[in-house]
């Protein structure tokens, strides 16, 4: 009878990859399909005792969150929690403050706590993350970032950026400032920015770009410096609603005709509609993304094959 080493040799993968597959850990869809076929053809039967040890489920789900007091995080976790309640899972949260080492620690802590699965709201995926996720043999689903070797739920950030760029071009805005974030965050720092640039280029417009932080207070410092140096933009775009709120605050306090500035953010935070004049924003379906993530994670826990990547579209909530 074939053993794990035999299956690994036939598949051309490591024994640890086969072990992750058998324990419903994180392997690519292509590898899952290959192992499905090989195991079926060879009538491989995993050690029942070993499987029974892993089958002792705790009905606990771990969620790793990057920020507190964030509309995006709150809404995503709301969606996760709704599905957890429906499926009788308890939800544990671990807050990491955008710190990679704390994220690594959280993954290992949840593994030691024997959670059935992990929802990871990532701002970037490094080799360190990948190494730990592959090692812990716990189903992990990523929300907010894409990686070819992991199961991911992502928002269509390129679409979001393009909608804003195209809308500004159609409206006749030409002198445009964009406050972006580091490209280590692929979704916001790369995809969203590239979409915006493409939307503007369709109208032969090039934005002036500065980098800032996700943190409101830190963004405020960068916004003040940039807009004091050149205050004459007719439209200003923040890569997030928090950055857009910092822009709004500066304009409200420093310019007597702040309403003449067209300010745009991303996320759909209700605060953007409360301030006056309101901030135009792209709505993200964060709660829905959270519910999809938890539903798919449950399928992984049940040893079902799921899509490698699911893209959630965004919505333009304001009129041109």
From Swiss-Prot:
Domain of life: Bacteria
PROSITE patterns attached to this UniProt entry: HTH_LACI_1, HTH_LACI_2
Keyword tags: DNA-binding, Repressor, Transcription, Transcription regulation
DNA-binding segment(s): 4-23
Pfam families the UniProt entry points to: LacI, Peripla_BP_4
InterPro entries: HTH_LacI (IPR000843), Lambda_DNA-bd_dom_sf (IPR010982), Peripla_BP_I (IPR028082), SBP_2_dom (IPR025997)
GO molecular function, one term: transcription cis-regulatory region binding
SMART domains per UniProt: HTH_LACI (SM00354)
Annotated ranges, domain HTH lacI-type: 1-55
UniProt feature coiled coil, ranges: none
Reported function: Negative regulator of scrB expression.
Name of the protein this chain belongs to: Sucrose operon repressor
UniProt source species: Staphylococcus xylosus
Lineage, top ranks: Bacteria, Bacillati, Bacillota, Bacilli, Bacillales
Encoding gene per record: scrR
């Amino acid at each position: 009878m074939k053993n794990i080493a035999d299956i690994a040799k036939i598949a051309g993968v490591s024994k640890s990859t086969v072990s992750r597959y058998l324990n419903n850990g994180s392997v690519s869809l292509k590898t899952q399909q290959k192992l499905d076929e090989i195991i079926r053809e060879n009538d491989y039967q995993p050690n029942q005792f070993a499987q029974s040890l892993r089958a002792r489920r705790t009905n606990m789900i771990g969620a790793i969150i990057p920020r507190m007091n964030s509309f995006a995080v709150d809404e995503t976790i709301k969606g996760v929690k709704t599905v957890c309640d429906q499926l009788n899972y308890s939800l544990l949260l671990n807050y990491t403050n955008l710190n990679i080492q704390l994220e690594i620690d959280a993954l290992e802590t949840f593994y030691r706590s024997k959670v059935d699965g992990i929802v990871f709201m990532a701002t970037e995926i490094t080799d360190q993350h990948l190494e730990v996720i592959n090692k812990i043999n716990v189903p992990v689903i990523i929300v907010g970032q894409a990686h070819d070797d992991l199961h991911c739920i992502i928002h269509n950030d390129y679409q979001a950026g393009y909608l804003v760029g195209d809308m500004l071009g159609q409206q006749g805005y030409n002198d445009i400032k964009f406050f972006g974030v580091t490209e280590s965050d692929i979704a916001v720092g790369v995809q969203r920015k590239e979409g915006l640039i493409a939307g503007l280029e369709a109208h032969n417009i090039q934005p002036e770009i500065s980098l800032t932080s996700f943190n409101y207070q830190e963004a405020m410092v960068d916004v003040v410096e940039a807009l004091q140096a050149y205050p004459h933009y007719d439209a200003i775009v923040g890569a997030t609603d928090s950055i857009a709120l910092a822009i709004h605050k500066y304009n409200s306090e420093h310019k007597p005709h702040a309403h003449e500035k067209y300010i745009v953010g991303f996320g759909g935070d209700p605060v953007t509609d409360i301030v006056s004049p309101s901030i135009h924003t792209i709505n993200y379906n964060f709660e829905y993304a959270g519910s999809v993530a938890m539903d798919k994670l449950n399928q992984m826990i049940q040893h079902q094959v799921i899509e490698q990547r699911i893209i959630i579209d965004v919505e333009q909530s304001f009129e041109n």
